A protein has these predicted regions:
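Active-site groove signature of glycoside hydrolases
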Residues: 106-126
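Structural preference for beta-strand elements that scaffold enzyme active sites
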Residues: 5, 13-17, 49-50, 77-83, ...
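Short, acidic/polar
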Residues: 28-44, 91-110, 156-166
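Acidic-and-aromatic substrate-binding clefts and catalytic sites of carbohydrate-active enzymes
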Residues: 27-30, 54-63, 87-96, 125-128, ...
Length: 205
């Protein structure tokens, strides 16, 4: 496996990561989560050390499955992500609700910290500005306590809007949809992130 430095951090992540949005539908519905956890463990055997998960993925079971797998490897050998936004908080942007959401993710993942915690699914600048106003301070607090190691964001915005987010210097990295069909709408944002020493992870390749 080829490993790359994540932005200006000291973290070396696998060039191919593991997305955990979908597992076998029948296994999930039947509660065969240990069987599902064989997938991230197999990925780990092949050198994949970046596991991406989130609340609500896979009928709200993805973090649990990831935690089952994570408990069977050395924690420092894997970089784990999760995510939060106003939707997962049911539009309740209180500190207590944010903390409950984060602690639920930590409990499910069977870990005491998350390597990359995403401000999740920023669709446009208006959405991003609202999340920055209401939630960013909670991210900073959690980071200062060691509950999360890096504040990052995921987005489906176009490149010029991504550039504006990057230029704030508030994030260590981003998760962005990027492929042969949409590259022209995202390229400038990715270039700006690289110039600013941010890590870039691609989804929907």
């Amino acid at each position: 496996m080829y490993y790359k430095q994540y932005g200006d951090t000291d973290m070396k992540v696998s060039a191919v990561g593991l997305g955990t949005m979908r597992y076998d539908e029948e296994d999930v519905k039947a509660g065969r989560l240990e069987k599902c956890a064989e997938i991230p463990l197999y990925a780990f055997e092949k050198g994949i050390n970046y596991w991406d998960t989130a609340p609500a993925y896979c009928h709200d079971k993805s973090e649990i499955i990831t935690g089952i797998a994570l408990s069977q490897v050395k924690r420092s050998d894997v970089y784990v992500t999760s995510k939060v936004n106003l939707g997962t908080l049911n539009e309740d942007a209180s500190r207590d609700n944010f903390r409950r959401r984060l602690e639920t993710s930590l409990d499910r993942l069977k870990t005491d910290y998350i390597d990359f915690y995403h401000m999740w699914c920023m669709l446009n600048l208006e959405s991003w500005e609202k999340h920055m106003e209401l939630l960013y301070g909670f991210f900073e607090e959690a980071k200062s306590e060691g509950l999360i190691r890096n504040i990052v964001f995921s987005s489906h915005m176009q490149g010029n809007d991504i550039e504006k987010v990057v230029e704030t210097g508030k994030f260590k990295g981003m998760l962005i949809g990027y492929n042969a069909l949409n590259y022209q709408f995202r390229q400038s944002g990715i270039r700006k992130a690289y110039e600013n020493g941010m890590g870039v992870v691609v989804m929907n390749p």
